Amino acid sequence: MKTISAKFEASQRKWILVDAENQVLGRLASRIAMRLRGKHLPAFTPHVDLGDFVVVINADKVQLTGNKWDQKLYYRHSGYMGGVKVQSARKLNAGNPEKLLRLAVWGMLPKNRLGRKLIKKLKVYKGAEHPHEAQQPTRIAL
């Protein structure tokens, strides 16, 4: 018996719509990452992009448990000495709620060429409106 390896050309990728309102950030991000990779499919192949496109709405209404709004910190660096910038989750969500969810999902994807390709299939919007109506995304509850 031979092992079947899925091919990218034979994949049927769908568009999925996810409402992030009152969803816990980490749990939602792990389910989105699973969909992006295609791990929900029986023909999952680790090195092939078989996952769906995911459109997330209401990213500004995502929830964090405990005191993570103030205790969870996001770091970035300008490249200069002493150029480290630190933001709490509350401040990041107030300024750019899409980035909060995108960083959570990015942390759960592989850090290679495939991961960079997968993160491009994630579309995050802070309101209930999105410009992907032409793709007719299927609304699912994760």
Curated annotation (Swiss-Prot):
Q: Does the keyword Ribosomal protein apply?
A: yes
Question: What name does the UniProt record give this protein?
Answer: Large ribosomal subunit protein uL13
Gene Ontology molecular function: any one: structural constituent of ribosome
What does the subunit comment say? Part of the 50S ribosomal subunit.
InterPro entries (alphabetical): Ribosomal_uL13, Ribosomal_uL13_bac-type, Ribosomal_uL13_sf
Q: Which UniProt keywords apply?
A: Ribonucleoprotein, Ribosomal protein
GO annotation, cellular component aspect: ribonucleoprotein complex; ribosome
What biological-process terms (Gene Ontology) are attached?
negative regulation of translation; translation
Looking up NCBIfam families in the UniProt record yields: rplM_bact (TIGR01066)
